Design a protein with these regions (language model features):
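N-terminal cap/lid segment of alpha/beta-hydrolase-fold proteins
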Residues: 3-21
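Active-site loop/oxyanion-hole signature of alpha/beta-hydrolase fold enzymes
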Residues: 25-32, 68-113, 291
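Conserved HGGG/HGGXW glycine-rich cap/lid loop of the alpha/beta-hydrolase fold
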Residues: 27-79
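The conserved beta1-alpha1 loop
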Residues: 41-45, 114, 247
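Conserved hydrolase catalytic core segment
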Residues: 107-149
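Helix-rich cap/lid subdomain of alpha/beta-hydrolase
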Residues: 147-211
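Conserved serine/cysteine hydrolase catalytic core
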Residues: 205-264
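Catalytic active-site module of serine/aspartate enzymes centered on a nucleophile-bearing elbow/loop
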Residues: 269-308, 312-315, 321, 328
Length: 328
């Protein structure tokens, strides 16, 4: 049976932010003709960690500089209490900015975003739109809950009730359940599932899993409401940025409502929807998704003209979602 070091064969890197160690993967080629390669920054959501991107890092790091942080409270990063760390969206964006600045990554960035990582990554992009070269969107969001999409009951319980706190922090229900329901083609291998849940192994170490859910704004006045609205408004700056969307249509949270939200906001995006895949699309359809991402980055290595990037956006915006089925 595979060990974590076998499944996740990367050197551990750490940066100290506000007294807390943030772990990140940093894999890159030796150099291409002395020129620094484009950076591919992969931002995970909840309840996962940098492990989610392990196969993508291995597929891209021969050509690109891959950076994958574990948010504070997740993965191999420190997991401080509320008295020592501000578990909020704004702080997550600050952390990502601090990490990238420490690595002197300030241009030619490809953002790969999943789950709440979309909000964090696009929050960073809103601050520095000129740094973003490409977007890769995987079952994620950078805007509020669509009006047509009620908050799923399971998330509402986790977000708003004492029972939810007990289930998430006492029994690791959120992370454990996600490792089962987040894939649809086939169950996760036991060693992979254990790797997903391993960092969240105690009441203290599950704090971020709960705080992420509690950080979701649902109405004006909620913490993050104004910030999420501003991130949403900033998306209009990226309608000429090459974008690819790879989406599992069996995601019970980030479903067609969110996908259609992206199509409305970024009509230039290339779309590949997988009818038989769930939330963890990099587990369900790893080979297909990675092949699409490699091709997409290679094809956009030379920036296209604005006219090419935005050709016929009205047609793209109104296009019907065509599921990929078992293969795309």
């Amino acid at each position: 049976m595979a060990t974590l070091d076998t499944l996740f064969p990367f050197k551990r890197h750490f940066i100290t932010l506000g007294g807390h160690k943030l772990h990140y993967v940093h894999e890159k080629p030796a150099g291409i003709n002395g020129q620094r390669p484009d950076a591919v920054v992969m931002v995970h959501g909840n309840p996962s960690w940098s492990f989610y991107y392990r196969n993508l890092v291995q597929a891209l790091s021969d050509q690109y500089e891959c950076v994958v942080p574990d948010h504070i409270g997740c993965g191999l990063s420190d997991k401080p209490g509320d008295d020592a760390y501000d578990y909020t969206l704004a702080q997550r964006i600050d952390d990502l900015e601090a990490l990238l600045d420490s690595l002197d990554i300030r241009s030619n960035i490809t953002l790969v975003l999943h789950d709440w990582g979309g909000m964090i990554g696009m929050g960073y992009a809103a601050r520095y739109p000129e740094r973003i070269k490409r977007l890769v969107l995987l079952n994620t969001a950078a805007f509020g809950l669509p009006k047509s999409k009620p908050l799923p009951l399971a998330l509402k319980i986790c977000r708003d009730t004492a029972l939810g706190t007990l289930l998430v922090r006492g029994f690791n229900a959120f992370s454990s359940a996600a490792s089962y329901v987040g894939v649809k083609r086939a169950p996760m291998a036991a060693d992979v599932r254990r790797a997903y849940v391993a960092p969240f192994n105690s009441w203290q170490n599950r704090i971020s899993t709960l705080r992420f859910v509690q950080d979701i704004p649902l109405k004006p006045g909620d913490r993050n409401w104004d910030l999420v609205q501003s991130i949403d408004a900033s998306l209009q700056q990226f309608t000429q940025v090459p974008t690819i969307i790879l989406w599992g249509l069996k995601d019970f949270v980030f479903d067609r409502h969110f996908l259609e939200g992206w199509q409305q906001r970024l009509p230039q995006a290339e779309l590949h929807a997988f009818a038989d895949c769930g939330h963890y699309i990099l587990e369900d359809a790893s080979d297909e998704v990675i092949a699409h991402i490699r091709r997409f980055i290679a094809e956009t290595a030379v920036a296209k003209s604005a006219d090419e990037q935005t050709s016929n956006p009205e047609e793209n915006a109104s296009a019907e979602i065509t599921p990929a089925g078992s293969a795309d």
